[in-house]
């Protein structure tokens, strides 16, 4: 099964920007850790990062038929983008929202997610480990989907 990892605006600046909030780890290093988990658990994984809302919407839509689940950190678009929310709802893939920082310890405007209501779950505040937790959760979702498929009567 395949996981599509979508990273939103400014996540390409991890390791440089606001290290007191996001930590020193670069996005490439987070992706390496996620790839290691995927390889160890028989999952395929693809990474995408964009600072542009429309490109993120396009990638979510392209995931339909190409991926089995999405892990997304929409960055600031989390709090503003109805378009990203609608794209997630449209593809109907299990989606996990991820944030490095605990958004509930930050500014009030960061405490409202437009996309959380259409996601399977939200993981926030564990730094880079948030992505590992998302991979564990997605792997569990995939196992549950496979178990349900195995229980379905075979079509003749």
From Swiss-Prot:
Pathway the protein contributes to: Metabolic intermediate biosynthesis; chorismate biosynthesis; chorismate from D-erythrose 4-phosphate and phosphoenolpyruvate: step 3/7
Keyword Secreted in record: no
Catalysed reaction, written as an equation: 3-dehydroquinate = 3-dehydroshikimate + H2O
Record site: Transition state stabilizer: 17
UniProt-listed Enzyme Commission number(s): 4.2.1.10
Annotated function: Catalyzes a trans-dehydration via an enolate intermediate.
Protein family according to the UniProt entry: Belongs to the type-II 3-dehydroquinase family.
Self-association and partners: Homododecamer.
Name of the featured protein: 3-dehydroquinate dehydratase
Source organism phylogeny: Bacteria, Pseudomonadati, Campylobacterota, Epsilonproteobacteria, Nautiliales
């Amino acid at each position: 099964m395949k996981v599509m990892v979508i990273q939103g605006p400014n996540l390409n600046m991890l390791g440089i920007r606001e290290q007191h909030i996001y930590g020193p780890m670069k996005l490439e290093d987070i992706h390496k850790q996620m790839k290691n988990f995927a390889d160890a658990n028989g999952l395929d994984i693809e990474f995408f990062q964009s600072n542009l809302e429309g490109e993120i919407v396009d990638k979510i839509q392209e995931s339909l038929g190409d991926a089995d689940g999405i892990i997304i950190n929409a960055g600031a678009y989390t709090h503003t983008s109805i378009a990203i929310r609608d794209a997630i709802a449209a593809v109907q893939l299990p989606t996990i929202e991820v944030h490095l920082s605990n958004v509930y310890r930050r500014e009030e405007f960061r405490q409202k997610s437009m996309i959380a209501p259409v996601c399977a779950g939200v993981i926030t505040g564990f730094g880079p480990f948030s992505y590992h937790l998302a991979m564990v959760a997605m792997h569990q979702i995939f196992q549950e989907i496979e178990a349900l498929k195995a229980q379905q009567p075979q079509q003749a």
